[in-house]
């Protein structure tokens, strides 16, 4: 079983020390006391990854590079591919493991390219990434010089995909906990930068989520919020009747201006809308490493500007704000 002793040991030496009992309790409740039917298969897939020294590791590039092809012999390469395939579908990336390109469903590097120019420099910062997926952006944050990165996401498969990288960078100060933002200790006031990318619309109460993000930030800290949006003014909010782009767990999608107002209502200052754009079929698509349905299947085949339910097609915005 994947354990989190390394995170707790690191937390014992930094500003999260006083929250260790809270983390231990919630990990027991949300992870150790629960079992997923596919856990054994995912664990076996992770064990297929060869024990090898990666001759290169690069986290400051669009495709995260772990090792080189020549680091593994043919038998090890075969075992590596078997293990990585055992964790299909790969949704967030891309990665390159020892010469093997993992073409993920999402071009998460494109999102980072949109977000990164608007950030306060991450060098030396204490960073939280809520809804971190496979951890791709966590590693990019480390590549920008972050001192400590904590990613949280409740998906157990993403946890295993994260550990495919962590296996070859075990001492990197990047950690993943299989938790939701609402599971985090309250009022931490600990992080210099908090990211929430692709989470807000999945929450029944967007205000509760924003408050959780604010509580994790230190005074003066920076929030980076990336979320779905719809066209409209500060009063425009879409509440799907059932599904949105085939997703059942979408509750509220505000316009950029409405989302900005939500942040201001929750007490954030210097709120800026720094990027807006429609999600393209090149950014989210089916690949050899994600063979299920993707964005194209969720849009009206006669009109790609609408979802199959008739709503505006997915568009996204990035907002940056400061906690007073």
Swiss-Prot record:
Carries keyword Signal?
no
**Keyword Transferase part of the UniProt annotation:** yes
Q: Name one GO biological process term.
A: tRNA wobble uridine modification
User: What's its EC?
Assistant: 2.5.1.-
Q: Name one GO molecular function term.
A: methyltransferase activity
Superkingdom per UniProt = Bacteria
InterPro entries in the record: CmoB, Mo5U34_MeTrfas-like, SAM-dependent_MTases_sf
Residues annotated as binding carboxy-S-adenosyl-L-methionine are 92, 106, 111, 131, 153-155, 197, 201, 316
- Here the disulfide bonds are none
Task: Return the broad EC class.
Answer: transferase
Q: Which key words are in the record?
A: Transferase, tRNA processing
- Substrates-to-products reaction catalysed: carboxy-S-adenosyl-L-methionine + 5-hydroxyuridine(34) in tRNA = 5-carboxymethoxyuridine(34) in tRNA + S-adenosyl-L-homocysteine + H(+)
Functionally, this protein is described as follows: Catalyzes carboxymethyl transfer from carboxy-S-adenosyl-L-methionine (Cx-SAM) to 5-hydroxyuridine (ho5U) to form 5-carboxymethoxyuridine (cmo5U) at position 34 in tRNAs.
Q: What's the family?
A: Belongs to the class I-like SAM-binding methyltransferase superfamily. CmoB family.
For this protein, the record's PANTHER family field holds: METHYLTRANSFERASE, TRNA U34 CARBOXYMETHYLTRANSFERASE
Q: Can you state the subunit structure given in the record?
A: Homotetramer.
State the protein's name.
tRNA U34 carboxymethyltransferase
Give the source species: Hahella chejuensis (strain KCTC 2396)
